[in-house]
Amino acid sequence: MLYADARSVRTEASKQRQALQDFSFIRVSLVKGKGGWKIGSVAETKNYYTLSVNQAARGSVVKVIRLIRRFLAGEEMHHSLFDECVTALEFFSTEHADRTCYEHIFTQRILAQLGYIKLSDVPKDFTAVPLHELPGDIVCVHDTAIALSIKRAQNASQL
């Protein structure tokens, strides 16, 4: 995760205004300045919030981004975490039954990758399989245990 500054982005004449919105997947060029990173140019690839099919899907997209902002700090590269998040945003922006169960699995995976949850606590059936390939009936069987491990990790992290 990287935070950067952009000047006059909210003005009507700004060319970067449309691309620099929350929940956008963008391609950006950055310059390291004295006070941090500065945005040079930006091009929007897609906005997962606006592409979401309904209110529940938009809520799931918001939860993914909030989770990342809450637990990820610093300027380290996490390729697997990035890929997992993009896959989850694609998955959650469409219609799904058992949405809460899938959200819990995604949260547990992210917290395990960041070291807040032991990898042994993640069910082996869920570790390497993309969200869209997990059957809903199996996902919801483990939901109570997954939700409990997430709650313990969030309390222990004090974030």
For each of these PLM feature ranges, what is it?
Residues M1-L159:
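Non-catalytic alpha-helical scaffolds and adjoining flexible linkers that form interface surfaces
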